[in-house]
Amino acid sequence: MSMQTAPIKKTTLNHLQAKKNQEKIIAITAYDALFAQIFDPLVDVILVGDSLNMSFFNQNDTLSASVEMMLYHTKAVCAGAKTPFIITDMPFGSYKDEKTALKNAIRVYKETQASAIKLEGGKEKAKLVKTLTNEGVIVVGHIGLMPQFVRLDGGYKIKGKNEEQQKKLLEDALSLEEAGVGLLVLEGITTPIAQTITQKIKIPTIGIGSGKDCDGQILVWSDMLGFFDSFKPKFVREYLKGKELVQNAIKQYADDVKKGNFPNELESYH
């Protein structure tokens, strides 16, 4: 009799929403199958972020990321990670109107195994969110510091420092929740308003640079593992000196080759 392996339990939106006020959601970025496979058993959510334009392609911002780029990397991540809830960023310009957004979101669903798409913007995106969810697309919202607006904002600026900003952030969160977003990313928001939003809305919040009171946290993997060291935001905690460790290994390899120590007899065919 053949032995059948137990089916892999895929994390769903229902699983994540059930964690609110119960258990913190663990999220991280990934852009390829190798790291997605490594992260798979350890996280609830993997975001294929347009941040890859900076950390993977060494660009100054996320704006030149394309739909094709996001599809390519999402396919790779889905090939490596089988259990996490996988979110794909909708890149700049890919959801400028309902027709464009629907076309690109449906492409993500048809061409990859992504669980959801993420878009940036507040209450002005509520109608678009409703349109997408009516077509069966799970939408993750993103408010606060929005990297796709970096040129308009004149840089990466923390939000929620005054009463006007705090009021807008709360209005945005409530509007997006009503429109149907399943999760809400809070980026670069002062801790008190992030806490208020998390308490006021029923869907989980995932924070990045928004304090510890969010329902979950996300970091860019190359930041937290010490690979992307040209600039380190205040909110990043390095858990590994990855760049240094890899460079030391390559130096050792190069030294072994130069000295004739690699390959040795056990590493050679006869």
Curated annotation (Swiss-Prot):
Its cofactor is Mg(2+). NCBIfam families: panB (TIGR00222), PRK00311.1 (NF001452). Gene3D superfamilies: Phosphoenolpyruvate-binding domains. Catalyzes the reversible reaction in which hydroxymethyl group from 5,10-methylenetetrahydrofolate is transferred onto alpha-ketoisovalerate to form ketopantoate. GO terms for cellular component: cytoplasm. The active site is at 187 (proton acceptor). Binds 1 Mg(2+) ion per subunit. It catalyses: 3-methyl-2-oxobutanoate + (6R)-5,10-methylene-5,6,7,8-tetrahydrofolate + H2O = 2-dehydropantoate + (6S)-5,6,7,8-tetrahydrofolate. The gene is panB. This is 3-methyl-2-oxobutanoate hydroxymethyltransferase. Homodecamer; pentamer of dimers. One of its GO terms (molecular function) is 3-methyl-2-oxobutanoate hydroxymethyltransferase activity. HAMAP family: PanB. Pathway: Cofactor biosynthesis; (R)-pantothenate biosynthesis; (R)-pantoate from 3-methyl-2-oxobutanoate: step 1/2. Keywords: Cytoplasm, Magnesium, Metal-binding, Pantothenate biosynthesis, Transferase. It comes from the Bacteria.
